[in-house]
């Protein structure tokens, strides 16, 4: 590689980094304002880099506030591998929770056992092929296979998302949810289960209430 090519590549990198830093600064200012925002860019444009910069800023500037209130910032990403990458950058006791959408949805709804039991036992959509709804005492989600065993109804992956949507339509649940998760970051939001995104927009973003996204 000759010197001219090397200098040209270095110049392009510097320009790209300067532009990325400007965008990151704009994102931070939006975070400070409390308004929700969306970052749209093509593959390889640095969205993941920006996400990591935002996470670093939140961890450095919001620790005392969110930790004192026992609140969590959630970073929803598409794969478990991406969750692991983000987790490696966080302090062990961080209030930032990287998660897939399925894990996040289940953590948000799992304590509402009465609602879950009532819903799955009155709706054939959740019936396991090898069981019935008699004497369901608990609803849980582990490997994503739907079956019933020893009074426990195990949910399919999409069951969790649908039940989360149903609870998001409940006003009381939304109040509790918003208080627990004041900020939700969604990586690759266009690949996230659309009914959930629609509810985030309709119940929170359009009404300018609840979590910041």
Features from the language model and the residues they span:
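P-loop NTPase Walker
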Residues: 1-114
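Short acidic/histidine-centered micro-motifs embedded in hydrophobic/aromatic stretches
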Residues: 104, 180, 203
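Accessory N-terminal region flanking or inserted into the helicase ATPase core
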Residues: 1-45, 50, 115-188, 193-200, ...
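Conserved RecA-like helicase ATPase core segment
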Residues: 57, 202-213
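Structural motif corresponding to the C-terminal cap of alpha-helices
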Residues: 59-63, 168-172, 204
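Short helix-terminating capping/connector loops at secondary-structure junctions
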Residues: 65-71, 178-179, 208-212
């Amino acid at each position: 590689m000759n010197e001219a090519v090397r200098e040209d590549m270095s110049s392009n990198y510097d320009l790209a980094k300067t532009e990325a830093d400007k965008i990151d600064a704009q994102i931070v200012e939006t975070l400070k304002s409390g308004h929700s925002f969306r970052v749209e860019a093509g593959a390889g444009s640095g969205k993941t880099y920006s996400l990591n910069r935002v996470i670093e800023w939140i961890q450095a500037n919001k620790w005392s506030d969110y930790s004192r209130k026992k609140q969590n910032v959630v970073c929803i990403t598409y794969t478990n591998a991406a969750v692991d990458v983000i987790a490696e950058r966080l302090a062990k006791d961080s209030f930032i929770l990287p998660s897939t959408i399925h894990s996040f949805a289940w953590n948000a709804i799992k304590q509402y056992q009465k609602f879950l039991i009532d819903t799955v036992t009155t709706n054939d959509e959740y019936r396991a092929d090898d069981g019935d709804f008699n004497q369901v005492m608990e609803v849980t989600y582990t490997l994503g296979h739907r079956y019933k065993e020893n009074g426990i109804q195990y949910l399919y992956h999409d069951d969790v998302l649908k039940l989360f949507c149903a609870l998001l339509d409940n006003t009381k649940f939304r109040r509790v949810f918003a208080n627990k998760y004041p900020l939700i970051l969604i990586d690759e939001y266009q690949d996230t289960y659309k009914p959930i995104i629609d509810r985030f927009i309709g119940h929170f973003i359009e009404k300018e209430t609840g979590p910041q996204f």
